[in-house]
Structures are given as C-alpha cells and as structure tokens.
C-alpha cells in the first residue's frame, strides 16, 4: 500500500492520479475533509481507503501497523502563507511531519514530503538548498524550513529514503478548493468565464515566478520514489516567467478578453516575493533529466482541463 497524506488536496490528488496512471490503486488517502468540496479531487481516481488526518495521526503515534507500506507521500499541511497562528502552523507542518518521519525511519519506509520555496523568504537570486540562502518571511515558510533543518540532521544516518521537495509556484488541475490561494491561472480563467475582466496587479510584467505545472511535480515525486534518491531538492522549472505571461497564455486559450490592472495592495508590500527561480543543479545532479513545461505549455493544458465541460 501507498499512503498519500493531503491526498484530497491539490498536489496530493495529482500524485494519486500519477500513481493510478501507473496502474497503482492500493492507496490510502489521508486528509481532513471538513472542507467537503475537496472530494471532487478524488471522484475520478481509484483508491483503496480513506482516513481522517486526526485518526491517522493517533494511529501513527501509537505505532499501529497499516500492513506493508511501500511509501508515504506526505503532502498534508496548512499551506496558507497568510495564516499567522504559529501554534496551529507548527503542529500541522512540523510536529505532524516529525511523527511521520520517525514512523517511516523505524520501518524503513520511503518518506517523500512537501517542503516549499517559502523557505527562501524574500530573496531575488540564489534559490539554493543550503542554510545560508534560507530566511522565510512568514510562519508557514518557517515551519517548512525548520522541518528541512530537522531532516538535514537525520539524513546522514538514515537507512531509508527521505526526500523533500521545495515546491515553487505550482499550478494546474485540482486546485479549485484552495480559494484565494489558488493560482493566478485559475483566477484569471474564473474571471473570464464569469464575464469579468481578468485582473493583475500593476507591474505584473515585472513580477516573475517559477511557475511549475502540477503534472511535472507529480512526475518528479514518482521518479524519486522509484529511484530511491534522498535529499532536499528544489522543484520548479528553473525558469522565472512573469504573471503577464500567465495572463497572455490564458487569453490566448480563450481568444477573448483584456487585462485590467489593479493597484498593488499595501498589505502585501514587503511580504510579497517579486521573483523566484529554482536552482535545479541538485535535482539534475540526482538524475532527474526530464524537461519541465513552460508557462505557455502548462497553462494551455490547464485551460483545456478547466474548460473541458464548456
């Protein structure tokens, strides 16, 4: 069996889909479905079982067995960069991850987990997986950074696979439940379909991020599991592209609309990453050599998925 925590969420459900595409359906999805809308992410997928996150954590902490586990993909976390309840964030993203990590180490189960580019904070260059480049801007980034630091202490002695992925700006199918935290591409598409002008912040041709398609993210996860490589790796495309490029690809797909530029909100000043670009040196050195979709390629594929019933 394979366990995917956060399996009803955005990246988790895409990992479940990637496993299904390989004929793997003996999957336990762990999640919190208090937000019942997330069920739609699993409707077209095949899994063996579902368990609530709290029940799962109780069983993990009690050392209970789940049969033969081939791997745990740990995508379950609070991923809101605007959540400032530090206790909630540390319980969810740090303590929970530590419990799972030790459970896996004791049983030599491969443990693949979600880290984040938020560990780098507000820097505009040198997004490199090393302590001197890491200075998170919010408690979410700090929770991810601290777990990476914890993993670094353990990696040299570990007898089983531990791999963390620092996700950059992930977008693509199955993120609709994320609301305001969903990608720009998702919001632009919704605005167009509602007959509104799609909106970007003023200066969006100058705001550049490493936008990575979720299908590529799932592919990297599975490749590392299949190849048993350990470490902490950036997971982006290695190419920064502008928010304007995302909008251009969205408008090109819809063949209509024009962008309305809105003032940059004061509350985001100083807390907004103006530029991100993954350094893929370590990822490539580890052996992953497949190309990543450009914004034009990924957004076009995503638009086709979002508008498949139109």
Swiss-Prot record:
GO terms for biological process: ADP-L-glycero-beta-D-manno-heptose biosynthetic process; carbohydrate metabolic process. Keywords: Carbohydrate metabolism, Isomerase, NADP. It catalyses: ADP-D-glycero-beta-D-manno-heptose = ADP-L-glycero-beta-D-manno-heptose. Its cofactor is NADP(+). Pathway: Nucleotide-sugar biosynthesis; ADP-L-glycero-beta-D-manno-heptose biosynthesis; ADP-L-glycero-beta-D-manno-heptose from D-glycero-beta-D-manno-heptose 7-phosphate: step 4/4. One of its GO terms (molecular function) is NADP binding. Contains a large N-terminal NADP-binding domain, and a smaller C-terminal substrate-binding domain. Binds 1 NADP(+) per subunit. It comes from Klebsiella pneumoniae subsp. pneumoniae (strain ATCC 700721 / MGH 78578). Homopentamer. The keyword NADP applies. The lineage of its organism: Bacteria, Pseudomonadati, Pseudomonadota, Gammaproteobacteria, Enterobacterales. CDD domains: ADP_GME_SDR_e. The active site is at residues 140, 178. NADP(+) binds at residues 10-11, 31-32, 38, 53, 75-79, 92, 144, 170, 178. It holds the Pfam family Epimerase. Belongs to the NAD(P)-dependent epimerase/dehydratase family. HldD subfamily. Catalyzes the interconversion between ADP-D-glycero-beta-D-manno-heptose and ADP-L-glycero-beta-D-manno-heptose via an epimerization at carbon 6 of the heptose. PANTHER family: ADP-L-GLYCERO-D-MANNO-HEPTOSE-6-EPIMERASE, NUCLEOSIDE-DIPHOSPHATE-SUGAR EPIMERASE. The gene is hldD. This is ADP-L-glycero-D-manno-heptose-6-epimerase. Substrate binds at residues 169, 180, 187, 201-204, 209, 272. InterPro entries: Epimerase_deHydtase, Heptose_epim, NAD(P)-bd_dom_sf. Its EC number is 5.1.3.20.
């Amino acid at each position: 069996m394979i366990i995917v925590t956060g399996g009803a969420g955005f990246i988790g459900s895409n990992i479940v889909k990637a496993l299904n595409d390989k004929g793997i359906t003996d999957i336990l999805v762990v999640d919190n479905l208090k937000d019942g809308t997330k069920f739609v992410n699993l409707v077209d997928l095949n899994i063996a079982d579902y368990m609530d996150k709290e029940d799962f954590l109780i069983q993990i902490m009690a050392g209970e067995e789940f049969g033969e586990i081939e791997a745990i993909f740990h995508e379950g976390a609070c991923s809101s960069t605007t959540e400032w309840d530090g206790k909630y964030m540390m319980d969810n993203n740090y303590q929970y991850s530590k419990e799972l990590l030790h459970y896996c180490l004791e049983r030599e189960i491969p443990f693949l987990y979600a880290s984040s580019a938020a560990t780098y904070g507000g820097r505009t260059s040198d997004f490199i997986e090393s302590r001197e480049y890491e200075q998170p801007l919010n408690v979410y980034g700090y929770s991810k950074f601290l777990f990476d630091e914890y993993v670094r202490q353990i990696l040299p002695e570990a007898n089983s696979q531990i791999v963390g992925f620092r996700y950059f700006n992930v977008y693509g199918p199955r993120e609709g439940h994320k609301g305001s935290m969903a990608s720009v591409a998702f919001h632009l598409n919704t605005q167009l379909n509602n007959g509104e002008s799609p909106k970007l912040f003023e200066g969006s041709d100058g705001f550049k991020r490493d936008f990575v398609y979720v299908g590529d993210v799932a592919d990297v996860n599975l490749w590392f599991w299949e190849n048993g490589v350990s470490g902490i790796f950036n997971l982006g495309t290695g190419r920064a592209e502008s928010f304007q490029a995302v909008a251009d690809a969205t408008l090109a797909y819809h063949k209509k609309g024009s962008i309305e530029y809105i003032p940059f909100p004061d509350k985001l000043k100083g807390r907004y990453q103006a530029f991100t670009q993954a350094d893929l040196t370590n990822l490539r050195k580890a052996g992953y050599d497949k190309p990543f979709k450009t914004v034009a390629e990924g957004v076009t594929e995503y638009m086709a998925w979002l508008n498949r019933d139109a």
